[in-house]
């Protein structure tokens, strides 16, 4: 080699061969379309390997040196850079391996490296031992590939139905191999390779490990030899070998010997069959088109030389090592010659064809038939290959049909021999030695050949020439070897042979003839013909019946003989007292007769086993009465062997239920097993005695086994409950007791002459137990003692046998102990991997033991429940606990471990592994047991390793590896595939249930997690890394990975959908569980790239298994959701991004690197045709997944019943429903079947019996309906599950993944596409309503995100605009682009307005589709609609105080902005739906589910707010819904009252109330709405509600706001405020809106205030000050300022008498006084003024609290000032008669600077009016506040315009006030968003405060001016002598008069007498000081800064001027 020596890490002697075998399998067996091309490539590449079959690379000096130095210099490894140093040990091993197999040194190194890599697959083996396995596995793969390729050739015997291209390719390839001498190589290898020699070599070099390793190596070597031999066999079947090759084969067979048991081994059998097929010309009889081609290929017919050579070779007199083998070949040759001679144009071959007789004679002389029987047919491998059977069948039938003279000769010879024997016997001589027994051997061969029929071929049918035409299906299948319809002539000859041989049958061949018939009767139709033959044989001799003459082979003869024996033996029967009778010789029957009887009994059994008609016909025959005679004979003294056969025949009869029922009674009557003890009888009788005395002594137990077999058959056919009634307690118990105590419990201690019989006994008795327990269903009556009368006394009847077995298995009984001990012995035996006698029976016995435990586990819960309810004094213990018990032999609790060890034998004994897995799955549900099991499983390192290997091996088992094509495999293979599959399912279910238990649990151990440390610290690795074993997790990933490297996707998803579904579920559970999530996801991400490689292939498509497919996708999507969430949290952006691209991209990706086009190519071209603009787009994967969920669901046809009542059937079905493992409610079909059948069985009378078949048919209809219904439920559940998972994935993508990974525009497009698709699917008429809730949920999330995305985009656009036109720019800029028609994306959002409208329409359609029901679904949809409508809402804009600069004209003429346009279109679309939509929403708002009502109200709120036409308001009023809502307030009252208790019930009512009030408030904002509400009496309703009077006492500690953060449930005070504030807001809004009806509104509100006056007073007293109480005050003062005014009383349309008028006036007066009192608290220098500065170190959420409090306090001041102004204006039309609310004292400003202590009391006594000083103080305070607010506002605006430039600390601080926790975890972009949000809030708060300050200033100035004007100009000072008295009386009366203007002619001046001149002078002087220059300048500055644009122009200036003027006037 010129290339440098490099090592192939996959081992060139193994990896490539494994690959060839895989490719061959894909092409030939799995029929994968793309595999043909790959196979062609690989065959061309590896042709030399096939030509130099099994040839190893030779040793080589250069390589030797290279390896020698590898520890220092290293070796290069293919596909890896650099070199790798090899350890010395490995180099040593490589040289040993090189010598051992005579292979090149590098090849040895490769094997060892591959061994090291594969080591995890072979736990417990070293790399050297694994290398040995790999070496032979490579050989096996190449041999198997060769065999498969040859099997796929075109040829004469079979076809695999492959494509012509593939068949031609393999035929051509194998032809080339044959030309290179394949036959010679194969025969040489078969001779050279010898297991024993190989083992000796390996043994010498310590190349053999454990028993399992030895077994595996020996199996591999045997398989190599066998596959090579079978390659030749397959070749010969398809196209015969040439002359040289045939001679080589003959030469090989000459030297062959037989095995120890006399049969040929598998290899030589295959080679013999190959040679026989070379001589096979049976295909000529076919009429296929290809026949002529084949004839030309057949050297037998075309080459004279071939015939001559072979003929002379076979005529050669030299003996072979096996003369019988030589004879077989000669016979085949003779028959071939005879066949050729019958063809036309063969005269040239006459010299050979005439020698056929002589050749056949030679064969017969060498006992050909005996050899075929003893060495060929008996071989265990013979029945494993269908074409062996067919070839021997052809051989025999050809002989019988083509050589009739020979057959006649054989018969004549037999007759002659029989005569000689007869004469010898008569003369008393020994029979002559020279006798030939050829005919006898031929018959026995025929009997043996057809005795088994594994492929259901029923080839023996050819021997029966039917008198009537047979209605057979085509039995021969698609094979070409045998004609579908034999020529009748052949059949005639064969059937003649069968009949004639029975005529005048000589006694010597009587038994062989019967055995032949027994073989020929094997099969349903054959049995029928044989029965007829025996019937006909007897009938022709009816006349001489008395002599028992007639044909000895007839029913007549046989049953007559039986009767005679019975008569004869019955007379001989000694009395019961004669104890010794059993030991007398049985005089009745000679050995010869016994053999004959046994042969006939076996024939009878065969016939009646197959043919039910024969069974019934024989049984019902009046003269023969076989059952009676057999039972009679069983009571006689005959040998046990004969008794056994009689019992077996009875068992065959017992297959029919009608016969079985009577058989039970007969058995009981004849006491075959003694069940009744007669007191006078000293000696026990029956089978028990036979077992104990005769069989035990002989150490053979045929009778016991036969008896068990009989019982086994009978319990299956019919089970009598009252067996033995009248003579003993009725029931099966005596039989069960005998089987349990005498047979089962003692089977181990008995002696056995034949070792295998021990296990046969165990198997057959355990089978009975299994059947009894399988058919037992615990019933309530089993647990009640049933009394029966027996001979005049009451006795307890026996329990059902199932009950008894359950009781024994749920206790530490000998039976359970023996069963467990048997399991232990079984697993020990299997661990030896050695054959032993009775192995098959031991395996069966173990299987029954495991099945018994399984059944017990399944039934124990019901059994124990019923036992608990009953009065029975029985104690049982759950089996899972018993299994935890101590094993008496090992003194350990290892029972479960023993059961689990069977999984280790899953490959060799799949049934045992299946039962074991089922038991483990059953007991794993209990978490306490889990912990113990983990301990038991991990206690011993070697056992732990084995158990893990067992589980992994069962999961790994690849049936596809065996290439069993299910449609062509045998029944057994299909069954095993199903069992292996079920085992894997059970193991996965075990993992799933275990994962739900707390750690430590079995699943964690099996999946490779830490058990001794915390689970989350596990570091999962690939197998072999850091000593990590191969675990179930690796096996599961392996199952799912297969196929992900190609374009088809995971193979398991298609081929074993249920398995794949559970695998995905396990992985999801691991990812979802907090302990296992971290390690699992890390491992899947780093080592496997699992999710990406799996998600590529979504959606899966598998219509046939839709349920599994949907669940697979569900678990995978859920796992993907977790992965996206986790990677997003951990900031693993690249991982997140990769998955997002995969799911969301609409650009095609090419995942295939090797030039195979991606799947999307076709899509691209298709879409290219359809949409020219999106030519390169493909459908997003997330949408494809949605497409794959079919929303429509077929519903089964309703039941049509004739007999049963439909309603009752529905009821029964409902009663049979239960929750399955997945939590779906399905009907238990088995239980339903039992109930219905019991119902039918209960019917009495003839009519019922006649109609039974019809009733059963109807039951079948019901069951089919229920199965359909279950499937429907499961399918809907799966669809819902898939849709939920899809929704979860979509939600995670939108919420959890970093926003910047999806561009804003793409984000909107994605949401739009998903929304449109999901709507289209659910709005389809076929869509299942059950899916609506999930879809609605998804729509809600999607709309929320769409709304967010669009609004974010709007904000971002706005941020880019210049600072001045901040928001105006954004609103106007949209109109600079061209109109929408030209540019589709212009408009509101990236997705364009039209898309938004479509979404809105679909949402509304969806709402209407839900109709009356589905309110919860609509709840989601209302939420979605609200989010959608939010898009058209203007975002919070910062009030920069700039916008107002525009003139009114500019504002009126501004173009419509995007928000208004969208809003207008939205409302137009909503209104186009008319009353239908209104009706649905209004109905939901009024009744139904609370959340539904809240959302419906919110939606109404939103729509009414934008509905300019007021259509909805009109509908609400006219349809009465508004009135209903208003009236419901009174109903809410009581519920709300209950919410004020300290521990409230649910707060739902509160939230519903808040929603309702919010909606009513929204309605009240519209003038028309306010009028409607007044008309509906909303305020009257509020006045009636008592809840407002239930104001809770506040906690004094909560002064100045709550120090403790509030809990989730608000305190009673907060709850009360949540109830009161909406009512106050509603009143305020109504007062504001109802301008036309203002007085009416004010009157009603006043009544509301008065009816709750206590509460109102309490609020006005304002005992504690908190944000909440200030809010209340702010609202209340606002209402009072508009409602409690003079003149309102006169408008009240109530008939008030004097007294009530006084009362009302009193209330109003009190309100006034308290309001004015507030001024001194909030406007004065009181410490409340300092309230806002109390808490300097404010934290996040307290910041906004502080803002709220500040705002509320300013609002209160503003409201009180407004009230003062209103009182003044309304009460005093002229200045001269002004109402003075303030005394002319300015002392307030002076004397109130110090803090006061009595803040709890009202500050101003009610008799004292506040002085004007408070106004001045407020004015100054407000002016100062204004400037601080103004600065703060300006700073915030500039910060907002430059957020990105702010220092990080400031940004953080801003964020914290919005989001107190977790600021550090969010991205910078998100921090900016939060900071902006906070700044906008601050700006708007400051803007409001500025507005309030400005208002307060203006009002203060106005009031000051009015008072000063009055005092300084119009007031007449009085003398002050009685000022105190005057002030007390006059002020009081004046205030009342003022308030109500009740007496208009009141002389105001009289009230002013109390103001002295001194007061006035002091006032003027103080005022001049207080209202100084600085204050005036401030006020004018304020106007300049603010009031110009905001309010009355130069109002402040005018007032200041006037006040200044007033103060200048000198008073004289």
Swiss-Prot record:
Show the GO MF annotations.
structural constituent of nuclear pore
Highest taxon listed in the record's lineage: Eukaryota
Looking up InterPro entries in the UniProt record yields: Nup186/Nup192/Nup205
Tissue specificity, per the record, is: Expressed in the testis.
Q: Which UniProt keywords apply?
A: Acetylation, Disease variant, Membrane, mRNA transport, Nuclear pore complex, Nucleus, Phosphoprotein, Protein transport, Translocation, Transport
Membrane-topology annotation of the record: Peripheral membrane protein
**Residues modified as Phosphothreonine:** 3
Q: Name one Pfam family in it.
A: Nup192
Q: Which residues carry this modification: N-acetylalanine?
A: 2
Indicate the transmembrane segments per the record: none
Where in this protein does the record say Phosphoserine is found? 575, 1165, 1167, 1939, 1942
Q: Which residues form the signal peptide?
A: none
One Gene Ontology cellular component term attached to this UniProt record is:
nuclear periphery
Q: Name one GO biological process term.
A: nuclear pore organization
Protein location: Nucleus membrane; Nucleus, Nuclear pore complex
Q: Which family does it belong to?
A: Belongs to the NUP186/NUP192/NUP205 family.
What disease is recorded for this protein? Nephrotic syndrome 13: A form of nephrotic syndrome, a renal disease clinically characterized by severe proteinuria, resulting in complications such as hypoalbuminemia, hyperlipidemia and edema. Kidney biopsies show non-specific histologic changes such as focal segmental glomerulosclerosis and diffuse mesangial proliferation. Some affected individuals have an inherited steroid-resistant form and progress to end-stage renal failure.
- So what does this one do? Plays a role in the nuclear pore complex (NPC) assembly and/or maintenance. May anchor NUP62 and other nucleoporins, but not NUP153 and TPR, to the NPC. In association with TMEM209, may be involved in nuclear transport of various nuclear proteins in addition to MYC.
Q: How does it assemble?
A: Part of the nuclear pore complex (NPC). Forms a complex with NUP35, NUP93, NUP155 and lamin B. Does not interact with TPR. Interacts with TMEM209 and MYC.
- Put simply, this protein is called Nuclear pore complex protein Nup205
